[in-house]
């Protein structure tokens, strides 16, 4: 009994006695919290909307106390630039919550310091413009296959369903080719998600893609034990109910199969003293495994980093393309402008990265999609590695930092009619250079999205192939398609139906 009371007393002191961090952060505005829990229970299940609401009340720099974790939320283009560009070294590290230590902090997203730099450099060596361009045929083939399957699945009224799921199939195949190479398990199978007679391989692929979506949804929830460790049993119950661990196991099993397949191949080549000749590129897993075999990184980093890349590349890009298509369907005049620009300026099927400059309106549509839908609305949190001043407020070393990309992309301070889809804002506006800088959907600073260049090329190529060959329209023109996504770690586009017609 005495030990229990003593333990309770120590815990209470731990939460109630002001720390160095809280003393420094005390002048930052924010909502008044409760003892021990702080502001945790003032954040509802829709974390993104809660963060947005606090921004509207307290401004671009505000403080939250989440259990025993001091947190500062940064919003607004100028605030994010001051923080992650001009003070980039103060915010380069990730704040690794307990729920993110599922990979022991050895993956490319959650690692820090020199080890993270090694993982990042390995990836970037495979993302040169020339190597990205070399994926054109594979991307184009997957886009055409997906579009053909959509067209074949239309009913008598030319209506197709499950568009977002088909997008995810396509992106899963593209990311498998990028990460694991042409011989990756499943990557050469069809995309037809509407076929009821799929073989076992396609059924397993469907299950993997479903697990990716559900994993992202669960990961976007608030895990209370990240901030109050004693609540871990309750979180574990909820995570089990939401299949968090089951989904993660499905993903790691798939990645492990492909990684071990490539490792065996590399070992065979090394044993036979075989060297590759004349290859323009390596798969991502091959690049990581070579560094593992040289003793530069741990095998766990190969597995977890490939899992990171597969997750992020599949779900975020698929949802971006799905939202883009929704906007083109709801705004048919914009879709026709994109089509006319493509057929006028791109005469052949060879699409390079530089061809984006020939299609400014198409690029404006893509930028507007990134702005309006903010696929990664809060990104992953950062760690403040030293005391720093932002917008006149002192932020203490050790503070968790959140990039509020969602509110920054929808603030009336930076955008006219921020909730409307207006690509022309990137073309007609006199201050176009400033507007281009305002696209923060890939994050800012040293920890911005490492796959940005590949994603931009892949999205551009997909839009060109789809809109050049097909016209998409609303089966019920008087009822616009739903443009509001489901919030999680990424914004998920709801499935929708559309009419599809081949262009003449």
From Swiss-Prot:
Pfam families: p450 (PF00067). It is found in: Membrane. It is a single-pass membrane protein. Disulfide bonds: none annotated. The chain crosses the membrane at residues 1-21. It comes from the Eukaryota. SUPFAM superfamilies: Cytochrome P450 (SSF48264). GO terms for molecular function: heme binding; iron ion binding; monooxygenase activity; oxidoreductase activity, acting on paired donors, with incorporation or reduction of molecular oxygen. Its EC number is 1.14.-.-. Heme binds at residue 449. Its cofactor is heme. CDD domains: CYP1_2-like (cd20617). Keywords: Heme, Iron, Membrane, Metal-binding, Monooxygenase, Oxidoreductase, Transmembrane, Transmembrane helix. It is an enzyme of class 1 (oxidoreductase). One of its GO terms (cellular component) is membrane. Belongs to the cytochrome P450 family. This is Probable cytochrome P450 513F1. It comes from Dictyostelium discoideum (Social amoeba). The lineage of its organism: Eukaryota, Amoebozoa, Evosea, Eumycetozoa, Dictyostelia.
């Amino acid at each position: 009994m005495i030990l229990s009371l003593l333990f309770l007393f120590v815990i209470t002191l731990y939460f109630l006695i002001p720390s160095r961090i809280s003393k420094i952060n005390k002048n930052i505005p924010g909502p008044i919290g409760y003892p021990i829990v702080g502001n945790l229970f003032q954040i509802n299940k829709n974390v993104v909307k809660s963060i947005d609401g606090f921004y509207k009340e307290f401004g671009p720099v505000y403080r939250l106390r989440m259990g025993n974790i001091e947190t500062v939320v940064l919003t607004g283009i100028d605030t994010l630039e001051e923080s992650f560009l001009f003070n980039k070294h103060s915010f380069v590290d990730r704040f690794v919550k307990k729920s993110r230590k599922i990979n022991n902090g050895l993956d490319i997203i959650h690692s820090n310091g020199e080890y993270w730099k090694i993982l990042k450099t390995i990836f970037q060596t495979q993302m040169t413009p020339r190597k990205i361009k070399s994926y054109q045929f594979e991307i184009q083939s997957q886009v055409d296959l997906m579009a053909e399957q959509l067209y074949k699945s239309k009913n008598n009224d030319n209506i197709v369903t499950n568009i977002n799921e088909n997008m995810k199939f396509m992106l899963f195949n593209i990311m498998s080719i990028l990460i694991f190479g042409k011989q990756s398990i499943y990557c050469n199978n069809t995309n037809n998600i509407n076929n009821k007679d799929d073989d076992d391989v396609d059924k397993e692929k469907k299950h993997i893609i479903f697990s990716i979506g559900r994993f992202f949804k669960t990961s976007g929830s608030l895990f209370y034990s990240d901030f109050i460790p004693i609540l871990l049993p309750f979180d574990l119950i909820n995570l089990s109910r939401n299949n968090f661990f089951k989904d993660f196991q499905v993903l790691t099993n798939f990645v492990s199969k492909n990684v071990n397949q490539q490792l065996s191949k590399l070992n065979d080549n090394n044993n036979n003293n075989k060297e590759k000749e004349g290859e323009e590129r390596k798969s991502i897993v091959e690049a990581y495994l070579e560094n593992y075999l040289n003793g530069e990184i741990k095998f766990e980093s190969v597995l977890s980093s490939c899992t990171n890349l597969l997750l992020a590349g599949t779900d975020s890009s698929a949802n971006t393309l799905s939202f883009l298509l929704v906007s083109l369907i709801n705004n048919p005049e914009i879709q026709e402008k994109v089509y006319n620009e493509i057929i006028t300026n791109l005469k052949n099927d060879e699409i390079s990265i530089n061809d984006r400059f020939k299609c400014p309106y198409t690029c404006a549509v893509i930028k507007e999609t990134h702005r309006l839908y903010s696929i990664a609305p809060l990104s992953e949190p950062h760690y403040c590695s030293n005391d720093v001043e932002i917008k006149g407020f002192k932020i203490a070393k050790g503070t968790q930092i959140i990039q509020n990309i969602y509110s920054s992309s929808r603030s009336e301070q930076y955008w006219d009619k921020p909730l409307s889809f207006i690509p022309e804002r990137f073309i007609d506006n006199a201050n176009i250079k400033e507007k281009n800088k305002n696209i923060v959907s890939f994050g800012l600073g040293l920890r911005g999205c490492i796959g940005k260049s590949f994603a931009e090329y892949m999205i551009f190529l997909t839009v060109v192939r789809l809109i050049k060959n097909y016209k998409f329209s609303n089966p019920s023109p008087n009822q616009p398609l739903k443009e509001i996504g489901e919030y999680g770690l990424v914004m998920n586009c709801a499935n929708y139906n559309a009419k599809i017609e081949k262009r003449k």
